[in-house]
Amino acid sequence: MKITPTSTPSETVRALTEGKTIIVAAVNQKGGVGKTSLTLNLGFELARTGLKILLIDLDPQASLSKNLIGEDALPNRKGIEELFLSDKSKPEECIVSLPQENLFILPCHNELASVSAKILLDSSSFFALKEIFEKISGFDFILIDTPPSLGILTLNSFIAAEHLIIPIAPAVYSLLAVNDLLQSIEKTRKNLNRNLEILGVAVMMIDRRASLYCQIEEQVRTFFGTKVFESVISRTVKSEEAVTEGVGVGSLAPDSKIAGEYRNLTAEILCRLGVVRPAEKAVGDERR
């Protein structure tokens, strides 16, 4: 998809939101669907437009944190679990500036798993993440990488976020799991966060040479309709390499097919948020 900005994205976002941070969570209780890769690459692409982006690692596996900060350096950093446990802890003491300009991360450690069990004992535990975000300012977007479960941490992301992106990978697609996820989202919207919406469904790790993958993609598009983004993310080793090296694929291999796919997906997301408007398709961008 070719995109024509209404003005520079950073200026338009701030004008539309009056300085309010846009909070988006990548959610799916299935593992291996590309949540971390999606969060990382959207963060990089949005940061390159001049927007100030904060990544939140809410997955106790801490893959996003380990890849962006480094496994050796991560133990020396404070993480989001400290903010869950103590009102006296300050977000600015935990947020890490990354080499990519305008990109930051609030990391976590493996201990977040035990912390999530402790916060369940608190009657206000559902709103813990939202309360943390209320102490954070100065960012245009907050992007949340959630764990592969529908537990208390994912529920916290439902309550703290305004928009959800559901990444779906054909290799691990389960309609039953999708229905469970949608029921959980709807229950949260009805009872705890009326502003919550599904911004879109992203088809991840697709290989159109495999007929089964194409069939599942069509099933996803039939089931979700216009919620599915036109842009898809291909299955490629470049994406895995980028995550491992802690950079966006657009930095690692800017001329690659998958880098273009992430640029297109980012543009679609901004378009759905009303930040940019679509123009005519560019040659070669048509969905095959």
What does each model-identified segment do?
Residues 1-288:
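P-loop NTP-binding core
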